[in-house]
């Protein structure tokens, strides 16, 4: 499931438990606590995302893609279950 770059709405209860790949566009910056189903294994956030990921990413996520400025500030919050971490710039 991929959201457009201009999407920036609350996602709680909106994502199906059958989704395995979840990608948010550049403008998404909403609280994700309890919003990402445990079916998700691949997760991508856009450059504007600055919400807490600490204990908010399910342990099912093994592939995580984050904008580089986010990783520099909050690397210690990346779950240990993530085996593939990708940092990107514009």
Region spans (language model):
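Concave beta-strand-loop units of leucine-rich repeat
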Residues: 1-10, 23-31, 44-51, 65-73, ...
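Leucine-rich repeat
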Residues: 16-21, 37-42, 57-63, 78-84
